[in-house]
Design a protein with these regions (language model features):
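A short core secondary-structure module
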Residues: 164-206
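Short Gly/Pro-enriched turn/cap motifs at secondary-structure boundaries
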Residues: 100, 142-145, 169-172, 186-188, ...
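Alpha-helical interface subdomain recognition
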Residues: 1-92, 114-117, 126, 130, ...
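N-terminal glycine-rich flavin-associated loop
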Residues: 95-118, 144-147
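Flexible, small-/acidic-enriched active-site or ligand-binding loops
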Residues: 149, 202-231
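A gly/ser-rich beta-alpha-beta helix-loop segment of oxidoreductase catalytic cores
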Residues: 133-155
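Short Ser/Thr-interspersed hydrophobic loop/turn segments at strand-loop and sheet-helix junctions
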Residues: 57, 86-91, 183, 199-204, ...
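A short, charged helix-loop
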Residues: 221-248
Length: 404
């Protein structure tokens, strides 16, 4: 953010990308280099990032264009490679800017996938312009990785849905204008008894005031629903189709989480290279030591490994959109795409953690100084290994697929 560091662009020449993606990456990097946002107050900063990203039309990559551009998107469909490029570039400069962008996409993704034309027209253009802040409310205190165990209830009577329960670890909690919320509509059916709803922030009975402080500050809150009454048009997608919709939404954005991790890792490497070339010790620079060169080489390889898996996962999804075939072929393709996204998310986030830790070690004491870029990256990367599917969940997805 406002940094003299610039992200590399040579990877944009890889065959995963086309001219649109290459232009996007270069334009966004130039724009981000000029931005200065005070991030000392994470809620205020996120609102500011959403405003800027919306005003400058970057949020248009969070939603599809719709007929004649009516939904406000930049491209005809949600493009996974564009999402990866945007998140990688934003995260290189500011993980909080990346968070602000990502939650607009995740929070509105289910509306893109399953919303009625009226729901899409009501919400998606305002998400794309930054006029409304979106949130995705799935997790609960006892239902994180085991999302199917959620206990929030939705009961139906006389054409009205009544929501009771709570959600926690909700990104954009307390600042969002609406929450795509998942609730049990038939507990006896387990995961097949979950339905999604769109709940506006000003709905009576919704309390989002319980903020959660974490090691890398960003807006998180617990939501409490006390007899929240919703009209029938608040239901999102099919009755009892909520769990499938939640998983489809997460699948779309999983590769982009990996992209964000790659961006943070690239920034850590840039910081380490710059510092090692300047730091003098024992009559030479830190970069002159073979041990430093070995560490830098390992960091670069770790980044590329994660990046290539990430770009492959995004490309596979985009190709499936372009070449839709038979239902049988699509089922096989879905499995392949899910595994590819899991590999990308697992590898990119775990490798980014290693790269940032190695970069911090090269900085010595300066690496743990509060306020330094490496110190903040060290805090920022940790949660990325957990949210939208922890590393262990990705390992299970991959392992089960290999054993089939």
């Amino acid at each position: 953010m406002g940094s003299t560091r610039t992200p590399p662009t040579t990877h944009l020449a890889l065959p995963f990308f086309d001219a649109v993606h290459r232009d996007l990456g270069k334009r966004l990097a130039a724009w981000m280099a000029a931005q200065q946002v005070d991030e000392s107050d994470d809620r205020k900063a996120c609102r500011e990032w959403v405003r800027r990203l919306g005003d400058s039309q970057w949020l248009r990559y969070c939603v599809p264009a719709g007929d004649q551009g009516a939904l406000g998107g930049a491209l005809a469909t949600l493009d996974s490679r564009a999402l990866v490029i945007v998140r990688e570039t934003l995260a290189f400069y500011s993980p909080l800017a990346d968070f602000s962008f990502a939650m607009q996409g995740l929070g509105s993704g289910a509306i893109t996938l399953a919303g009625t034309p009226a729901q899409q027209a009501t919400y998606l253009p305002l998400v794309a312009s930054g006029k409304k802040i979106a949130a995705f409310a799935l997790s609960e205190a006892d239902a994180g990785s085991d999302a199917g165990a959620l206990q929030t209830r939705a009961t139906h009577s006389g054409g009205i849905w009544t929501i009771n329960g709570s959600k926690t670890w909700i990104s954009n909690g307390g600042i969002a204008d609406f929450y795509v919320t998942f609730a049990k509509t038939d507990p006896a059916l387990g995961v097949r008894g979950i339905t999604a709803f769109i709940i506006d922030a000003d709905t009576e009975g919704l309390d989002s005031s319980e903020h959660i402080a974490v090691m890398a500050p960003h807006p998180l809150a617990t939501l409490r629903f006390s007899d929240c009454r919703l009209t029938a048009d608040r239901q999102l997608g099919a009755l009892h189709g909520g769990f499938k919709l939640a998983m489809q939404t997460l699948d779309i954005f999983r590769a982009s989480v990996a992209g964000a991790a790659v961006g943070m890792a690239r920034r850590a490497l840039a910081e380490a290279v710059s510092f090692s070339k300047q730091r003098q010790m024992f009559g030479q620079t830190l970069a002159d030591f073979q041990l430093t060169q070995a560490k830098i080489g390992e960091m670069a390889a770790l980044i590329d490994a994660g990046a290539l898996l990430t770009y492959r996962a995004a490309w596979l999804r985009d190709e499936s959109q372009r070449t839709q075939s038979s239902e049988h072929d699509d089922a096989l393709g879905r499995s392949e795409r899910t595994v590819a996204a899991a590999m990308a998310k697992m590898t990119a986030t775990e490798n980014a953690q290693r790269v940032i830790d190695m970069a911090l070690q090269l900085h010595g004491g300066m690496g743990v100084k509060v306020g330094s870029k490496i110190e903040s990256l060290y805090r920022d990367i940790r949660s990325v290994r957990i949210y939208e599917g922890a590393t262990e969940v990705q390992q299970l997805i991959i392992g089960k697929a290999v054993l089939r």
